Amino acid sequence: MRIAIQGELGSFSHQATLQIEPEAILIPCALSPEVFRSVLSGEADAAVIPIENSLAGSVVEHFDLLFQSDVRIEREFSLRIRHNLIAAPGSKLEDIRQVLSHPVALAQCRRFFAAHPAMTPSPFYDTAGAVKHTIELGDRAVAAIAGEQAARAYNGLVLQAGIEDNPANFTRFFLLRRSAQVHQQPDADKVSIAFSVKNRPGTLVAALQVFADHHTNLCKIESRPVHGQPWEYIFYVDFQVADPAVPSAVLQQLKRQCLLVKELGYYPAARLLS
């Protein structure tokens, strides 16, 4: 299966993809919109995108692209994020002076930098890209922070593993397909939707009451601005159900009282990947 991912080979998206589809042919894309275009054009059969980190929060651009694109979520899964200090072969920990990585990864390793004041963190566009650049540079005073997949992809040396501040660091990923090609999972128990309501008192409360009336487990709600309409919002909701008849009942009732409703996916709730 051809799967599009955002970023360089060796990224956490790469690592997550191989854990669920070990034989996948990866299509790395520089930007997130390219990932979605790759799926919609048929260049890729599916895409794997990060949607939320347990520490840094949501990847808001991906919520917008989900809403705008004719794709649906087929699966979700979570990956434990382990950050590693990676350098060119022959490098030594005590010689490192500059450390490259994505700003989120750098922020999640503050204790490591506090313990190594001689190292200067430097933002880079991508964790795996930082490793690729470091290995190509060949400067033994430069290192990068990324997952172990990046070290394997670019023959980097792991100088220190597990340098993240918080071991309870997980990222949720979605496996997406074109809407017409999604395979419905028999054990689906989680639904993602987007909806908007009129900007007047009580409309959002009334919409949320629908979930309570059907005894769903509302596990996430997030708002995003409507592009071109200041102070208007789209609400993204994840909810879990025990009865397979509930999702359609919820959607039907929401459609009667909301301006718009879009189902983003009906899939099995995630299991944690180590």
Descriptions of predicted regions:
Residues 1-274:
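Domain-level signature for soluble enzymes in the chorismate/prephenate branch of the shikimate pathway
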